[in-house]
UniProtKB/Swiss-Prot annotation:
Source organism (scientific name): Geobacter sulfurreducens (strain ATCC 51573 / DSM 12127 / PCA)
The protein's name: Large ribosomal subunit protein bL20
Entry's Gene Ontology BP terms: ribosomal large subunit assembly; translation
Family named by the database record: Belongs to the bacterial ribosomal protein bL20 family.
Database matches in CDD domains: Ribosomal_L20
């Protein structure tokens, strides 16, 4: 089997890692071994936190909807149940935005949910 010297490929692989590590502090952006560990960890955190972000935003929306629905005399669960009974298909993101930006509109939606009880 012929010998493979890998000069170009090895340099390209190292440069790819060091490019991803750009902006890291100290040796983590300069030395290949440190940069590899830092980049691996950063990519793992990024992957994990893309999932966590969805959970966090849903929790924030639910908190905002709950606060606004309690101002209208309903709990969050009763509001959601009433909206499902009334066949109002507004998702939590839009409901939370309404609760913050348009309280009157939200209270009209809450009255729709109240009418189901």
């Amino acid at each position: 089997m012929p010998r493979v010297k890998r000069g170009f490929k090895a340099r390209r692989r190292r440069n790819k890692v060091l490019k991803l590590a750009k902006g890291f502090r100290g040796a983590r952006s300069k030395l290949f071994r440190s940069a590899t560990e830092a980049v691996d960890r950063a990519l793992n955190y990024a992957f994990r936190d893309r999932k966590v972000k969805k959970r966090d935003f849903r929790a924030l929306w639910i908190t905002r909807i709950n606060a606004a629905s309690r101002l209208n005399g309903l709990s969050y669960s009763k509001l959601i149940h009433g909206l499902k009974q009334a066949q109002v298909e507004i998702d939590r993101k839009v409901l939370a935005d309404l609760a913050v930006s348009d309280p009157k509109g939200f209270s009209e939606i809450a009255t729709l949910a109240k009418a189901q009880f």
